[in-house]
């Protein structure tokens, strides 16, 4: 199994998306719901700091500052739980590698880093297993850039890097292998806006409001078990 360990520390990348939380080995929706007692209808609850949390049942709404509430912290703990379970690790020192939209990183980088580092020790329980994680460091990078940083030498002339997520689209101009900082943009244009437009078109044409999950599945797979009059509009 592929491990990411450097000087005895687990390197854990977490993409804190508006639609989904992504790690090396796990992906789940970014919604989170807290309960005072263990939920009866799920076996996938995270227990942390005296509460139970169910994640992954829905997407989180768009926010311009990911440190403005507790959700992304809980989602980070959930990401650690799922990723460490996959790696068969229950106790470790960890370095988190995370991202922010390219146009926000200058203003929000330090605040987001402090937000994720506020507790050095994190204890939680997941699937009946106790975990203990010591956060050694958090490193914040521009979203999307990590995907090409090792191949910048291949980018001759003018190139545009586009990272299209659920809530935002990040674009970066790369000239002869060098990112141009003045030509980096973050727009509130992502998959969610496509789904909203799709749903609005269906409502206007048929008077039927298609559920969000059905529209999302159609975008993912290109088909749905629906009448042609609906799928033709969705296309």
What does each of the following model-derived ranges do?
Residues 171-176:
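PRPP/pyrophosphate-binding module of the type I phosphoribosyltransferase fold
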Residues 1-161, 178-193, 205, 212-235:
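Nucleotide/phosphate-binding catalytic cleft detector across ATP-hydrolyzing
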Residues 196, 200-204:
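Long, charge-rich alpha-helical interaction segments
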Residues 164-170:
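Ser/Thr-glycine-rich phosphate-binding loops at phosphate-binding pockets of nucleotides
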């Amino acid at each position: 199994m592929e491990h990411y360990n450097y000087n005895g520390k687990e390197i854990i990348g977490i993409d804190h998306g508006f639609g989904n939380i992504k790690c090396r080995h796990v992906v789940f929706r970014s919604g989170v719901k807290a309960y005072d007692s263990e939920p009866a209808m799920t076996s996938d609850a995270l227990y942390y700091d005296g509460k139970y949390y169910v994640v992954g049942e829905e997407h989180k709404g768009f926010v311009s500052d990911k440190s403005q509430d507790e959700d992304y912290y809980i989602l980070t703990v959930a990401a650690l739980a799922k990723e460490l379970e996959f790696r068969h690790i229950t106790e470790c020192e960890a370095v988190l590698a995370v991202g922010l939209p390219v146009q926000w990183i200058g203003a929000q980088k330090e605040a987001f880093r402090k937000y994720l580092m506020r507790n050095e020790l994190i204890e939680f329980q997941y699937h009946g297993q106790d975990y203990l994680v010591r956060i050694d460091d958090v490193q914040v990078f521009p979203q999307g850039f990590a995907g090409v940083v090792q191949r910048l030498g291949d980018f001759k002339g003018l190139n545009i890097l586009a990272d299209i997520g659920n809530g935002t689209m990040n674009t970066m101009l790369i000239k002869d292998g060098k990112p141009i900082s003045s030509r980096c943009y973050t727009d509130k244009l992502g998959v969610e806006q496509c789904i909203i437009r799709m749903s609005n078109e269906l409502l206007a044409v048929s008077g039927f409001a298609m559920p969000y999950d059905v529209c999302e599945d159609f975008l993912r797979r290109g088909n749905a078990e629906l009448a042609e009059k609906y799928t033709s509009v969705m296309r």
